[in-house]
Amino acid sequence: MSAAAKNQNIPTIFNNHFAEFINDICTIFPDNVRILSAKNALSTIRRANPKMIIKIWINYVATPYENQIDRGDISFFLEKDYSSDFVDYNQSDNIMEYINMLRDPIRNMGQENQAKAMKYIQNLSKIAELL
């Protein structure tokens, strides 16, 4: 498989892993309507523009917070105010809403599940680096 073909598969791999992450959160909090809303919104975005989520992840998560991700610092992500990170992004309010839809339940998880959530963040960042 050529390098170009491998790169074309990266967004699919990333999106599948991201969907798995959200599904795991849904499993822990099956009655949380906000998580289901985030899941549906991300699914819609993925169908409309499969590369959008990974590009946002690279620019706004993986690159600026590489050190915190590498350290596995879940508390950083749970407490951080992201509003200034998306000032230049035209849908910043929507992104902040989705972040909070996912972050709030993670904040309410036990340590073991928070560690799993952090592992997802680390894995997603590693996958994104391959693009």
Residue ranges of predicted features:
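Terminal low-complexity "docking" segments
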Residues: S2-A115, E129-L130
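Short, hydrophobic/amphipathic alpha-helical patches that form generic packing surfaces
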Residues: K119-I127
